[in-house]
Structure formats: structure tokens, C-alpha cells
Amino acid sequence: PDSVDSVSGSSGDWIVEANFGSEQLADGFEYVNDGETISINMHTDSIEDAEDINIVGVRATLTYSEDETSSGIGCNAPGASNPDPDTITSTMVYNEMNMTESGQNSDGPPSSHSVEVEWYDSSMIGNVSNVSKSQITMGLDSGGIGLGAYALDISVSVGTGGAIGCTHTDDGEDVEYLVELITLEYLSLIHI
């Protein structure tokens, strides 16, 4: 293989390896009422030397359990006290880019889902043909995109089970969130 420097301007075939990392932007807990949407606002100013990081995306992971309660004599019937799942929806927003994902909780271990927004050219990773080194770099170097304000919107739509003589109550859910910037930390280019 040729050295990268000797072929930086020529088009050709490349093996491109990229190592991704993450940088925590925010985390916390919020109680979200049924039908409510809360917005969590964040900014990369909270990260030291953020301008030196190649930010290529953002990921939010939400974790939640079921807290539906039931009461009444009818709850002794088989299945009457089983909760109905709630739908937890998250929208990750950066500039004009956004993505929405939903998940449902269950009566058991905590459930979770993630939502990601990315702005790098994933076709420039792996075996890449007929491009120059500078085209690869342009596709994978964010050039400062990723700095600034972010928002995570979380909403809950509860489902309540129940049966005759068994009343269910579910006003919302406790939602834990973790927001991470996706970083491209290292790039290896081999001209083939």
C-alpha cells in the first residue's frame, strides 16, 4: 500500500477505519405526566474544549419502568391487575436535524430505547472506491458542526389496564435520560 501523504490528492481505492467515541452532554431523571412533553435543553458550552472534538452525531438513551397501580376486589381475578404498557417518545433535535423514536415499558425489568442524529457520511468508512483522501476527510470531519444548542423532547402516553372491580392508576412515568455526543476520534486511511 502507498502512504497516505503520497496520494492525498488522487482518487483511488481506500480502506478507511474509524474509531468512534462519546462525550456526555447531559443526564438526569424527569417525571413526565401522561400527555405532557418536556424539553431538556443542552449546549456544548458545558463541555471543556468542545471545539477540539470532531462531533459527528448525538445519541439519547431513555430508560423507564412501569409504575401503574391497581386496586379493588376484582384485582384478584387472573390477569386483572396486569398493567398495560405506556409509550415513551423521544425526539432529539440539533439545528434543523431531528429524529424521533418510541419505546414501551413493561411490568418487569426496566425498558429502554435510543434515538440518534448523525451528520457524517458513513459511506466513507470501510472499503471506499474512486475518491480522494480529501473527499474522505470532508465526509468524516464535521468542521465544527455539532457545536451549539441541543434539545431532547420526551413525552409519555399511558395505557391503563383494568377489569370489573379493578381500577388502574397511571399518571405518567419516571424517565432517566443520557445524552451523548458521538465523536469520531481516529481515522486510518490505507490507499490500495
Region annotations inferred by a language model:
Residues 190-192:
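Conserved small/polar residues in nucleotide/adenosyl-binding loops
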Residues 55-57, 130-165:
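Noncatalytic modules at the cell exterior or secretory-pathway interfaces
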Residues 34-119:
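Acidic, Ser/Thr/Pro-rich low-complexity intrinsically disordered segments
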Residues 150, 158-186:
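Edge beta-strands of jelly-roll/beta-sandwich modules across compartments, strongly enriched
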Residues 62-68, 94-96, 156-162, 181-185:
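Beta-strand elements of well-folded, non-transmembrane domains
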Residues 1-28:
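N-terminal leader/pro-regions and domain N-caps
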Residues 22-29, 98-147:
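Extended, solvent-exposed segments with strong compositional bias
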